[in-house]
């Protein structure tokens, strides 16, 4: 697998075939769900992750299947996003709604995952870019990718990342997920990413 660095970032950004109408349907389904029922990672006055059932979100399977196909090309082995409807005990995907003034701190994802990713459902202008952190000869190097509606970014699961403050007047909505190679030995802890991997 190639290094995840700024100079080759275009190899990690993709554009799934999902129409504006399909994204609108996803957004509507999210807002019509009980957003307080299944959520986790309460930091800085907001819940980071919202977990919604696969059968309540139209077109979700299509997006996650695409992530698996692209992930295989990157990693060189078959990878999937575990889901309850596929027989796994938890979902390795979650939704993130960042309201105006909110941000996401530095973190990485679960140890067992090989790749992680984000799909942008609705990203208003000035609602925050995704930032990545690499160590270069013991020097911290931070860099960013402009978040754009309809794009998908994959990256190594142990890659530290965060999201800038939402400076817009609208919610920023994205889908996060983890990809695992088969067979999956075990998926530890709760849905999403581990509390111990959050750097605030």
Show where each model-derived region lies.
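Catalytic core of non-heme Fe(II) oxygenases with the double-stranded beta-helix
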Residues: 87-154, 158-159, 164, 170-174, ...
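Non-heme Fe(II)/2-oxoglutarate
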Residues: 1-86, 195
């Amino acid at each position: 697998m190639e290094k995840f660095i700024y100079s080759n970032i275009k190899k990690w950004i993709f554009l799934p075939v999902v129409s504006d109408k399909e994204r609108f349907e996803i957004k509507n389904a999210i807002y019509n769900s009980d957003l307080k029922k299944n959520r986790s990672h309460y930091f800085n006055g907001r819940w980071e992750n919202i977990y919604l059932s696969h059968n309540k979100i139209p077109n979700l399977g299509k997006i996650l299947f695409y992530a698996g196909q692209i992930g295989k090309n990157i990693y060189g082995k078959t990878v999937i996003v575990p889901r309850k409807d596929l027989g796994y005990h938890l979902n390795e995907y979650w939704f993130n709604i960042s309201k105006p003034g909110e941000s996401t701190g530095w973190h990485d994802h679960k140890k067992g995952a090989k790749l992680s990713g984000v799909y942008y459902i609705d990203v208003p202008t000035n609602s925050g870019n995704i930032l990545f952190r690499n160590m270069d000869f013991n020097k911290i190097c931070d860099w960013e990718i402009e978040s754009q509606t309809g794009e998908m970014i994959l990256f190594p699961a142990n890659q530290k990342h965060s999201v800038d403050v939402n400076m817009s007047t609208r919610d920023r909505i994205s889908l996060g997920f983890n990809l695992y190679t088969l067979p999956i030995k075990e998926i530890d802890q709760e849905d999403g990413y581990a509390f111990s991997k959050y750097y605030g």
